[in-house]
Amino acid sequence: MIVNKQTFSEISVPTYILEEEALRRNLTLISHVAKESGAEIILAFKAYALWKTFPIFRDYISSTTASSLNEARLGFEEFGAPTHTYSPAYLDSEIEAVARCSSHLTFNSLTQFERLHVAALSANSNLSIGLRVNPEYSEVGTELYNPCAPGSRFGVTSIKLPDVLPSAIEGFHCHCHCESGADVFERTLVHIEEKFSRWFPQLKWINFGGGHLMTRKGYDVLHLINIIKGFRMRYPHLKVILEPGSAFGWQTGPLVSQVVDVVEDRGIRTAILDVSFT
């Protein structure tokens, strides 16, 4: 990228610059994947929540995903549509407010479901309830960030599910990826089906979470489309949902900062910026 200093001359504090053309390019690709595959693709606020760009997003997608009450409010009040909401744990004092801002609400455990789903449905009778499941497989390399590592706090493993799900549970939510390719999704899907397909006839939808970095250069978009189409052919009654975050904002502009000092030690010169070193 060639930087024109004059472009940033009036910026005095660290600033992310969003390039609308680049953003729309990502949105166009994501919209294409959704149309061709038949999946619903929604925006994850965990990775992207620049609410002033929501009018642009509404030209391409219809919903968002939240992980807290404030994120659910952001989607409901600023994006203009109820959210798909998941949290590792909901507070009793917030569950009704979360439900009123949501179209889908996913519980992390059966105990949370049992304790709170009645209150959630009382607050919003149109709510679709889901359960996060853990296929015990993920190719995320760093254990700290692996949602399916042994002892993970995320989701219910197959051995803990009853043969017949509670009637209020309409969907499963899986999140196993981080900036992953379509090949990783394909391999992960084998494990998801192996562990959980016997419950699929009882469901209406399945959410394959985020981490699908489909806007990255070299990503096999056609392969992703074919994977989803193949899954939908095997389970035509299931609505498929993906909720990437980084894919929407991927390489849509620079972070502008300033060098405020240069230090040297043992021949190594280091520029000190007015942004985090990491």
List PLM regions with ranges.
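Active-site-proximal beta-alpha core segment in soluble small-molecule metabolic enzymes
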Residues: 39-205, 227-230, 234
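A short small-residue
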Residues: 7-11, 170-175, 209-210
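Generic N-terminal amphipathic, Lys/Arg-enriched alpha-helix
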Residues: 1-18
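C-terminal active-site-proximal or functional interface alpha/beta core segments in diverse enzymes
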Residues: 180-278
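Short, flexible, solvent-exposed loop/turn segments with mixed acidic/basic and small polar residues
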Residues: 4, 32-33, 92-96
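Generic structural "secondary-structure junction" signal
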Residues: 13, 18-19, 147, 156-158, ...
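N-terminal glycine-rich anion-binding loops that anchor highly charged ligand groups
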Residues: 3, 25-29, 35, 40-48
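Active-site anion-handling motifs in enzyme catalytic cores
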Residues: 22
